[in-house]
Each structure stands twice: as C-alpha cells, then as structure tokens.
Amino acid sequence: MNKIKLVLDKKGIKQKWLAEHLGKSFNMVNSYVQNRTQPSIETLYKIASILDVEVDELLYSKDDIEQSKNKQ
C-alpha cells in the first residue's frame, strides 16, 4: 500500500498534474493512487522526486518511519 494520495492531498497537487510530469496517463496514476496497481521501483522514485518527498514517505506512515529511526 502506498501513500501517494495522502502526499498529493497534503501538497494540493492533482493527479492530472502528476500524470503529466511523470509521463504517464491519468488512468495509470489514478491506479497508483487507488492502490489498484503498484508503481515500479523506478516510477516510485520518480514520483518521490516530482513530489519532493522521500520514497519512505510514499510507502510508510510517519509513525513507522519514526519507530524505525528510534530503533537505530
């Protein structure tokens, strides 16, 4: 499960905008957002770069990330 929708909503970015910048169709991006299809690792890194977030933020909740940091 990914958090793309949460990041898009938080940043006020539309799926159409992401699709255009990613070079994918709106339907494909919508599939990612709705968790019907998972993006490839390469695409996930591109999405993170476009949205200016860490890949971890697209995959895990903030609580998961904090717990992981505290264990290190």
Per-segment meaning from a language model:
Residues M1-K5, V33-R36, D56-L59:
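Catalytic cores of transferase enzymes with a strong primary signal for eukaryotic protein kinases
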